[in-house]
Amino acid sequence: MGEARTIRKQEVAVLRHAIAAGITLIDTAEMYGDGGAEEVLGEALRGTGGERDRLFIVSKLYPWNASRHDTKVACERSLKRLGTDRIDLYLLHWRGEHSLADTVSAFEELKRDGKIRHWGVSNFDTDDMRELYAVTDGSNCATNQVYYNLARRWPEASLLPWQRERGISTMAYSPLDQGKLINRPSLASIAARLGVTPSQVALAWLMHEKDVVAIPKSSRIEGVDEILGARRVKLDVADIALLNKAFPPPKSNASMETT
């Protein structure tokens, strides 16, 4: 999103449809379209008739902008592109060369100034999270956004248990494994029985996980409606057993994966 101005009108329309249909969490980043995605979201928000207060906007910071000074500068740029006075959740996109202490200090200052409501990280493994927790105010981390889906269950080995013990939620990006999951027989079988789509089954599986928030994406209105429909899918014990057989939980030494 935000990479081509020729389709911006379509992207804005899809976002406005999603907001009108009841989607409240919208995830973006300064990396997406080099700020273009934030601009598209900002344009969409301007036409929603005051829906901003109902929405939970997530954006992410480049790691090379994560010094104490540059974090605040980057946040101001994102706020301007989004056309809003605050970001609900601001994440470090992945770990870089700047110290976690400096980044956290900047996040806490942005919170005090009302520029952001919460902060977190993305693409951190368990060791990274332990290091984060060791710095001053590191325990204020609200979430960790990671690559997690039925085919990529590595967070279950140690990351999810560690975060749950500390009240840190997990945001699952690429919940459909970049579309690779939709042709898997086990998903198709459950979907056919329930009268839904394989994508909706994959999303429903994530939604039943404690403290996990799935963040699927779609560039089409039909895709948005399919995502919304996943909330009504109820998987039973037999469904979960079938999925666990087709997509076994990880071994204890599973390592982090990213897209």
Model-identified regions with their sequence ranges:
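Beta/alpha (TIM)-barrel catalytic core signal, keyed to glycine-rich beta->alpha loops juxtaposed to Asp/Glu
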Residues: 95-259
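A short, structured active-site edge motif that brings together acidic residues
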Residues: 52-65, 89-93, 123, 146-148
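Short, acidic/polar
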Residues: 5-18, 67-82, 102, 127-131
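Structural motif
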Residues: 17, 21, 81-82, 114, ...
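Active-site mouth loops of central-metabolism enzymes
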Residues: 1-9, 59-69, 93, 98
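CE4/NodB-like, metal-dependent polysaccharide N-deacetylase domain
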Residues: 71-93, 109-113, 135
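Glycine-centered flexible beta-alpha turn that most often forms the glycine-rich phosphate-binding loop
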Residues: 26, 87, 119
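N-terminal binding-site loop/beta-alpha segment at the start of enzyme catalytic domains
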Residues: 1-55
